[in-house]
A protein has these predicted regions:
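Alpha-helical transmembrane segments of polytopic integral membrane proteins
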Residues: 37, 57, 61-64, 116, ...
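Short, structured loop/turn "capping" segments at alpha-beta junctions
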Residues: 130-131, 162-167, 178-182
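Transmembrane helix-bundle signature of multi-pass membrane transporters/permeases
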Residues: 22, 52-60, 89, 184-195, ...
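Membrane-interface alpha-helices at helix entry/exit sites of multi-pass transporters
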Residues: 46-54, 79-80, 177-188
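Transmembrane helix boundary and interhelical junction motifs in multipass membrane proteins
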Residues: 27-36, 161-171
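Juxtamembrane transmembrane-helix boundary motif
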Residues: 1-23, 37, 41-43, 48, ...
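A small-residue-rich subset of transmembrane alpha-helices
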Residues: 58, 186-202, 212-225
């Protein structure tokens, strides 16, 4: 009986985790790690290190399939995406290094709060930039902007250790004046690569994952990300802004509740923040990029 219960619980938890993560990825270019890892840790009692590795693995395919969907609908700028990715990766390392020199620069629940605020912003003040306005900027200027934004995003993620997907969406829409679909498309494109490096380093350090949980998470996240991405590309800007906003607000609330309930529990289970610090010492970079928390 116990085994069947366990399997059922595993399927339920991974299904809802994958659903939240997939919708977040496909709609908002949000990292799956923010949803999947807390759920695996809380409900399946999984080791935080492995949970983050599994979450990042789920991110890889979900982001890739979302990027493909956005790309097919001409909502992805591959060249500038690549330029930005290189600068994000480089400056995450710089940010990490600088933050190691400055004591106590972590802002633990910063990204949860940010997710929530960003969600509200999309509902209240939708991003209504058009593609035409976006393409009015010369190619050279766009490339230069991509570098500068990559540097900004990377440095902030490295320094604070939070909010990769969120920072990207915020900076792309508000600073670079990207139209929302292109911003999400670019964000998931970059995330597919950063999550891959993160996942690879996790399994290299922490050993093989729980394959059942990994496969279920990857599968469910992939399915929901594809559904969300197809819907997002068909939607009008206003609808998309609202949908993105609602999903971000919901994810923010869910993770916040978890942070609060987690405080009250026994201290013997490592807090997510501590697990992250250990991870960051071990991998140097991977987590901060993906901005899991």
């Amino acid at each position: 009986g116990i085994n069947n219960m366990n399997i059922l619980l595993t399927i339920l938890v991974t299904f809802f985790a994958g659903m939240g993560a997939g919708l977040g990825t496909g709609f908002a270019g949000m990292s799956a790690a923010a949803v999947i890892s807390p759920m695996l840790i809380t409900f399946l009692g999984m080791d935080p290190y492995m949970a983050v590795g599994i979450a990042l693995s789920s991110d890889v395919l979900a982001s890739a399939v979302s990027a493909y969907t956005y790309g097919k609908n001409k909502n992805l700028d591959v060249k500038n995406g690549l330029i930005m990715m290189v600068s994000v990766l480089a400056f995450t390392v710089v940010g990490s290094y600088v933050s190691s020199l400055v004591p106590a620069a972590t802002m633990g629940n910063f990204s949860v709060f940010m997710t929530f605020l960003l969600g509200i912003k999309f509902i209240v003040r939708p991003v209504m930039t058009t593609k035409e306005a976006m393409q009015g900027v010369s190619a050279g200027k766009r490339a230069a902007q991509s570098v500068i934004c990559g540097v900004l995003i990377g440095f902030i993620c490295g320094f604070i250790g939070a909010g990769g997907g969120m920072m990207m969406l915020l900076i792309l829409t508000s600073v670079l004046g990207y139209e929302l679909k292109t911003a999400v498309g670019t964000s998931v494109f970059i995330m597919a690569f950063t999550a891959f490096t993160g996942a690879a380093s996790h399994f290299a350090i922490g050993g093989a994952p729980d394959w059942t949980v990994l496969i279920l998470c990857v599968l469910f996240t992939l399915i929901w990300a594809r559904i969300a991405a197809v819907f997002a590309n068909k939607a009008t800007p206003k609808t998309l802004n609202r949908a993105t906003g609602v999903i971000l607000v919901l994810l923010g609330i869910v993770v916040t509740i978890r942070v609060i309930t987690d405080r009250g529990q026994t201290k013997d289970r490592i807090s997510v923040a501590e697990a992250e610090n250990e991870l960051e010492e071990a991998t140097g970079v991977s987590l901060k990029l993906d901005g899991a928390y």
